[in-house]
Swiss-Prot record:
Ni(2+) 1 binds at H139, H141, K222, D365. The gene is ureC. GO terms for molecular function: nickel cation binding; urease activity. It comes from the Bacteria. This is Urease subunit alpha. Carboxylation allows a single lysine to coordinate two nickel ions. Its EC number is 3.5.1.5. The active site is at H325 (proton donor).
Length: 572
């Protein structure tokens, strides 16, 4: 058989098994673990390439015969479940139809079943690109609809959160309260090119207000200290969530007025709960809310302002708190409230706990102490900072950082999908799931996606001057594509609701045109179901110094003064 050098092969078809890829300007390197294509039978689009009539493209099978709608060729997949692999990815009916070898089985060996390329198939050349699942942000304050565009520009295509616009309640809490508001927001998000699931208000001792919100269409309850995060509110929202099979998210009581962290853990009664702000700078029992990350029933996340921990983190957080929670810098009690939440010791520990797989998810806390367009960026910056601070993880092979990278990718893809009950639809690159995918140039991985595929259609991309003679001339901006236009946006985006709402006919009653899918399996999961982030060590916090110990070992790191993929990548 004819042979070519590894370097020449990489130039033609991209890297293969054993090749390594540097991610951006970080010190993180991934290595391809396996290649699902056949050497010498690669599917390649272009002039003089193999995907031509009668060659790699079948010229007699129709779409009714199962031909793909779209194929991404020779791409490097980075997925928390699959690992780091090389493959073609086939898309059909807006879903992932196959991962393996695409082409024409009439003339090619080893074509994966369901991955026939034909006249009905378009192609994206993935030879020198990385493919991930689209990001999921589980902590969205629905303050402004423009958040969706900024999130897509950093590879996030699903929102879970609440609000009704720039009210003070929405600025401070992630809540869409009551059936009328819920209905209007379900109708409003029809115009956004992202998936959306809405959180209702869980601060209720009464059954009626909780039940009516579940039937109206929420995917979960948010219990927030600004509305009173009492033990009774937690117990009753969790009990109703058990009945409805929806999630409960909590921002606990910073002032410890309603009890301490031990009382909140007792109020959980062993039930599954998603804890926002697990570190506490964004809110929660001062100074030791971080202890909840040790509980097997707690699905812990934290938000991106403190990730990675930098020399300016403490200073900017104070002003964030004052604005978001309607506080007055001239009132000493308000100042004390804000200062109680900002603790460099626990912020440092938060970064370490992410690296250890103890805190399982990243989110933004959009416009309410977090940046909606920086989730992937902060994920990779934190991974890089932790490698510099803590060295290689014991799970990583000597020559690559695959495990660490996959641990961090899981925090923004599959784990929030599991936590919110949508992992049967999105969250990973797996056959049968919705084709919500992001393509990255490795030089910009985590910072700037090349394009976002939403439900099988490109709906967001870096695009040059529309009046130019090519797609590439400057100025290159992120722009909406055809997948984000007209009725196609409705076909390719999902509104998630409770099963009770779906059974009650929320789609018809609210006049929704988008896909409407019920969340499920929210109440039967535990932290041990979270991918690569399932650790439950003992966590202690010194009440005087705020030092955090994990299984008796001090968990800390120094703040960084330089971040990867920062000023080199962005103007300003």
């Amino acid at each position: 058989m004819p042979q070519i050098s590894r370097q020449e092969y990489a130039g033609l078809f991209g890297p293969t098994t054993g090749d390594k890829i540097r991610l951006g300007d970080t010190n993180l390197f991934i290595e391809i673990e396996k290649d699902l294509r056949g050497y010498g039978e690669e599917s390649v689009y272009g002039g003089g390439k193999s995907l031509r009539d009668g060659m790699g493209a079948n010229n007699h099978l129709t779409r009714d015969n199962g031909v793909l709608d779209l194929v991404i060729t020779n791409v490097t997949i980075v997925d928390a479940r699959l690992g780091v692999i090389k493959a073609d990815v086939g898309i059909r009916d807006g879903k992932i139809a196959g991962i393996g070898k695409s082409g024409n089985p009439g003339v090619m060996d080893g074509v994966t079943p369901g991955m026939v390329v034909g006249v009905s198939t378009d192609a994206i050349s993935g030879e020198h690109l990385i493919l991930t699942a689209a990001g999921i942000d589980s902590h969205i304050h629905l303050i402004s609809p423009q958040q969706a565009y900024h999130a897509l520009s950093n590879g996030v295509a699903t929102f879970f959160g609440g609000g009704i616009g720039p009210t003070d309640g929405t600025n401070g809490t992630t809540v869409t309260p009551g059936p009328w508001n819920i209905r209007q927001m379900l109708r409003s998000v029809e115009g956004l090119p992202v998936n959306v699931g809405i959180l209702g208000k869980g601060n209720s001792y009464g059954r009626g207000p909780l039940l009516e919100q579940a039937i109206a269409g929420v995917v979960g309850y948010k219990v927030h200290e600004d509305w009173g995060a009492t033990a009774n509110a937690l117990r009753h929202s969790l009990r109703m969530a058990d009945e409805m099979d929806i999630q409960v998210s909590v921002h606990t009581d910073s002032l410890n007025e309603c009890g301490y962290v031990e009382d909140t853990i007792d109020a959980f009664e062993g039930r599954t709960i998603h804890t926002f702000h697990t570190e506490g700078a964004g809110g929660g029992h001062a100074p030791d809310i971080i202890r909840v990350a040790s509980q097997p029933n707690v699905l812990p996340s934290s938000t991106n302002p403190t990730l990675p921990y930098g020399v300016n983190s403490q200073a900017e957080l104070f002003d964030m708190i004052m604005v978001c929670h309607n506080l007055n810098p001239n009132v000493p009690a308000d100042v004390s409230f804000a200062e109680s939440r900002v603790r460099p010791e626990t912020i440092a520990a938060e970064n370490v706990l992410h690296d250890m797989g103890v805190i399982s998810m990243f989110s933004s806390d959009s416009q309410a102490m977090g940046r909606v367009g920086e989730n992937w960026l902060r994920v990779m910056q934190t991974a890089n900072a932790m490698k510099a601070s803590r060295g290689k993880l014991p799970e990583d092979a000597p020559g690559n950082d695959n495990f660490r990278v996959l641990r961090y990718v899981a925090k923004i893809t599959i784990n929030p999908a599991i936590a919110q009950g949508v992992s049967h639809v999105i969250g990973s690159v797996e056959v049968g799931k919705m084709a919500d995918l992001v393509l990255w140039d490795p030089r910009f991985f985590g910072a700037k996606p090349k394009m976002v595929i939403k439900g099988g259609m490109i709906n967001w991309a870096a695009m040059g001057d529309p009046n130019a003679s090519l797609p590439t001339p400057q100025p290159v901006f992120y722009r909406p594509m055809f997948g984000a236009m007209g009725k196609t946006m409705q076909d390719t985006c999902v509104t998630f609701v409770s099963q009770a709402a779906l059974d009650d006919g929320v789609k018809e009653k609210a006049g929704l045109d988008r896909q409407v899918i019920a969340v499920k399996n929210c109440r039967t999961i535990s932290k041990h179901d979270l991918v690569r982030n399932d650790q439950t060590p003992n966590i202690e916090v010194d009440p005087e110094t705020f030092a955090v110990k994990v299984d008796g070992v001090h968990a800390t790191c120094e703040p960084i003064d330089t971040a990867a993929m920062n000023q080199r990548y962005f103007f300003g």
